């Protein structure tokens, strides 16, 4: 294969034409793997877990299966709205987390529970002093310069996170998630479609073109409030501004004891079908069942949904295991009632964990172990 042909494969539909070779390889290899597999992810998997925090070489998933999740979720929540000292600590801790995942061969995805930069409040609308900040942080808004400063912190982090090979670590960046709901200050009831898209366009262009961040894959992920492709794309910034399309969906997968797998599968298919049509990646960006009381949830609910309709999803990520709460967890730990079923989920050839991956950041992808 000629060098030119090889590079064209890796830049297919990626919105950053100057993305690093490792980022292009990750994009291409995720697309390739999604034809026959799905990577399993867990939010905050290595930072803390059920009853523990800050222990090296540990995750609840690893304690159960022997492998880390293939995808580790982190959060830029600590990069703003705090003292400079606390921000610096958060940056340093997350940097090491991302590097460690890269060194092991895993993948990092980044959520952003973004404290309201106009009110000084939290990321939930009710905690953000009900300030509609999206029109204020867009270009020419009253808090635009403050937003640029926050993005510079993210840009500096991205450009400082390097593996032992000296290469920048690729990350899937998923800003302004679940925007179709009203619980976050960037949610649909609190900003116009135009304001949302303007902020998205500025965020990508400022990071990519002004700050020179070239190790991000940009993911668009509403919650589950759509039933058609048109509704899914209602606030879509455009194919030139998105690398991955996804969905967060807890409601159709057992939340509060309510299941609507038919609806959940239909929505996942809308995501997968659009990705294939637009030559994008697709993912099930968040899901899970709190406390996992359903002993066969992993195989009879999640895996069954993922395998239906021959969808192409790069990964599925379940939410965090809180360190203090006895009930707020979404992945099993040793002795948890769904552990035997999770092991069946882990052993299924369709699901991939970190131990299954091989050279996912290399252009000459060698597949799986």
Predicted regions and their residues:
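Substrate-binding cleft of extracellular glycoside hydrolase catalytic domains
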Residues: 77, 81-204, 209, 213
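N-terminal module-boundary/linker segments of secreted carbohydrate-active enzymes
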Residues: 13-73, 77, 86-89, 349-369
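Bacterial Sec-dependent N-terminal signal peptides
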Residues: 1-14
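Aromatic- and acid-rich polysaccharide-binding/catalytic face
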Residues: 72-74, 232-261, 319-321
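Hydrophobic faces of well-ordered beta-strands that scaffold small-molecule active sites
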Residues: 38-42, 70-74, 108-110, 171-175, ...
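Substrate-binding cleft of secreted/luminal carbohydrate-active enzymes
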Residues: 34, 38-45, 280-369
